[in-house]
Amino acid sequence: MKILVIQQKMIGDVLTSTIICELLKKNIASCEIHYLINSGTEAVVQNNPFVDHIILFKPEFKENKFKFYQFLRSIRDYQFDIVIDVYRKVESKLITLFSGASKKISYKKLDSFLFYNWTIPYLKQDHNSDLAIQNRIQLLSPLVDQLPSSISSKIYLNDSEILEANLFLEKHQINKLSPIYMISVLGSSLNKTYPFDYMADTIKKIASIGKGQ
């Protein structure tokens, strides 16, 4: 069974949606997972054992309608059985439509019936866990009977990357036995970035409470 998961967005969204790939692999025997993401975001997906193939959506597909049409036709050649559209924008809707898959799943919107035959209401209220995680898990409800309430996404490193990271920590005298926090202070745009003074105070509080490095 071939399954296409579509998540065209920034690195954080691409990483988060790998939980869909993981849950599919763990619950559907012998499924083959193809993950369609924007080029430039693949670093957080490489080495992931739950992703069989990465399909890159290139900038030229946005800029050139003919190249986008060629890409759409190439999607049909994969003969996907199921498409899960996490992105739910015009491009991904067309990709879903051209896929020819018998099961097409996404969130419920006014025009969803034109592109999908399974639509899931988008949760607006937090139920004691990350809302972004919950909404992604809900997309699997037509396929998986028992779903977890929460799950964490992971980055999988190869041996050389692990060695490089260990050398970096040793060079900067960071104790690997103590908690290590990696915090990004910049969002993907200005309106998704906290004020620097506020972020500086937040980091200080995290460091003082958690005894992290």
Where are these regions (language model features)?
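Catalytic machinery of carbohydrate-active enzymes
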Residues: 1-213
